């Protein structure tokens, strides 16, 4: 008996601890770090061949004898799952723009200006070091911010980071990634499929029309959203942008407003009380079942579709998509002399561009926006926050790796670029995290004048 009670107590403690862990903001960041370490170990072990072979295997869906669709596992992760990641980030960003921290033009323009500076300065640093060499083709490499890793580090810091700063980073990183996607489309893509691109924009237009005409059923949005993603996948433009476009179209106004909900709920509760006074069995009384179902339906219809979709995806995003993404992309082989890598113009351009250029550009353009009066930051944010988030934005990683593969054919240049990206991203993550941990006084007034 006593042993049984102790066992139940132990199980209860373990369950409670696990629940608290999964509820913590840091859990997603911890999963991300573990996944990154696993990927690096696999890529530098005897299983490296099997690891890369697995990612290159095709996952095919056959709908009929003449209709099938397949991508490699790596493509499903980077082009498919990451589109969902961008959807979640886009939903959060839209919510903040509509009713949150970015609801004013000045507050919304601050991260956009920061993103512009965070792209321009790293590119200029790289160009200045590589002008006149074949390495110049890699000028777009240090421009990118890896939104998944950046948000993962912010999540790892938990409540030491103000919520407003996370919102700022999301807006900055999405703008940065859209900029990187445009750079890829304009300067690194061999050709665009205008038919698919036009079809994708048509799907986007249809989604906007659905929103405008008051369609609230998420099923229809998801169906058209999948078509939107497929069109961009085949257009020559990175399909993750489809996630952002899809998020823009999701309605934020609920099907049932609060006034009508209040009236209906009051009526339903009154009717329910009448059935209870008659002492009817709820399992046998169909009237009670109908009333309870009506209350449930009305409550569900009072929730904005945007929040429904965001809440349904947030845990899947944090505990599955981001770790899987890390396992698939962090596997860089460390088989070169690190000193030689970062001392050459290519490696140095990437290293300085990401680790120094990002924070410099973000800081300068934020200051310009403040001085010109075109942007403003939340009162809880100060210069240390901007420097810290600017450094974390220097985590280029996957988008930088993607541009590397487009910019160079020489395997030696690709290897140097990848190692430099990894080192720069690591320095940026550590530097930014340390600064933000030292600046965890959320209540300080804004000193960005």
UniProtKB/Swiss-Prot annotation:
**Annotated transmembrane regions:** 30-50, 69-89, 112-132, 138-158, 168-188, 192-212, 218-238, 241-261, 312-332, 348-368, 386-406, 419-439
Where in the cell? Cell inner membrane
Biological process terms from the Gene Ontology for this record are: regulation of pH
Pfam families according to UniProt: Na_H_antiport_1 (PF06965)
Region forming the signal peptide = none
Bilayer disposition of the protein:
Multi-pass membrane protein
| Domain of life of the source | Bacteria
Q: Got a GO cellular component term for this one?
A: plasma membrane
| Alphabetical keyword list | Antiport, Cell inner membrane, Cell membrane, Ion transport, Membrane, Sodium, Sodium transport, Transmembrane, Transmembrane helix, Transport
> Does the keyword Transmembrane helix feature in the UniProt annotation?
yes
Family that this chain belongs to: Belongs to the NhaA Na(+)/H(+) (TC 2.A.33) antiporter family.
Q: What is this protein called?
A: Na(+)/H(+) antiporter NhaA
The protein's gene is named: nhaA
């Amino acid at each position: 008996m006593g042993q049984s009670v102790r066992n139940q107590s132990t199980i209860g403690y373990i369950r409670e601890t696990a629940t608290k862990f999964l509820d913590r903001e840091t859990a997603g960041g911890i999963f991300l770090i573990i996944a990154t370490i696993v990927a690096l170990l696999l890529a530098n072990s005897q299983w490296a061949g099997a690891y890369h072979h697995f990612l290159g295997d095709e996952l095919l869906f056959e709908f009929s004898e003449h209709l099938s669709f397949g991508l490699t596992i790596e493509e499903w992760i980077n082009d498919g799952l990451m589109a969902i990641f961008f959807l979640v980030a886009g939903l959060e960003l839209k919510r903040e723009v509509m009713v949150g921290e970015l609801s004013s033009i000045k507050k919304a323009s601050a991260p956009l200006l920061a993103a512009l500076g965070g792209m321009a300065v790293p590119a200029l640093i790289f160009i200045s070091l590589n002008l006149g060499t074949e390495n110049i083709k890699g000028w777009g490499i240090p421009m990118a911010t890896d939104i998944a890793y950046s948000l993962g580090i912010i999540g790892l810091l938990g409540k030491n980071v103000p919520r407003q700063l996370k919102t700022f980073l999301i807006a900055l990183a999405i703008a940065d990634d859209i900029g990187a996607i445009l750079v890829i489309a304009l300067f690194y893509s061999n050709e665009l499929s205008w038919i698919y691109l036009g079809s994708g924009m048509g799907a986007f237009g249809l989604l906007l029309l659905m929103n405008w005409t008051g369609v609230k059923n998420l099923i229809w949005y998801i169906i058209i959203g999948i078509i939107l993603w497929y069109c961009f996948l085949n257009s020559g433009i990175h399909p993750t942008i489809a996630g952002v476009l899809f998020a823009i179209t999701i309605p934020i106004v609920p099907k049932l407003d609060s006034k009508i909900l209040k009236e209906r709920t009051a009526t339903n509760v009154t009717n329910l009380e009448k059935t209870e006074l008659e002492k009817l069995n709820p399992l046998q009384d169909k009237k009670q079942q109908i009333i309870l179902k009506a209350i449930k339906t009305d409550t569900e219809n009072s929730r904005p579709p945007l929040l429904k979709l965001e809440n349904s995806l947030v845990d899947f995003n944090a505990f599955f998509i981001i770790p899987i993404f890390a396992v698939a992309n962090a596997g860089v082989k460390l088989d070169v002399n690190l000193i030689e890598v970062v001392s050459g113009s290519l490696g140095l351009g990437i290293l300085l561009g990401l680790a120094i250029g990002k924070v410099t550009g973000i800081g300068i353009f934020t200051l310009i926006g403040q001085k010109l009066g075109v942007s403003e930051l939340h009162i809880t944010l100060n210069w240390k926050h901007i420097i810290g988030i600017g450094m974390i934005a220097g985590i280029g990683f996957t988008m930088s790796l993607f541009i590397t593969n487009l910019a160079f054919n020489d395997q030696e240049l690709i290897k140097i670029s990848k190692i430099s990206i990894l080192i720069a991203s690591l320095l940026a993550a550590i530097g930014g995290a340390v600064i933000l941990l030292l600046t965890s006084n959320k209540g300080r007034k804004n000193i960005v004048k």
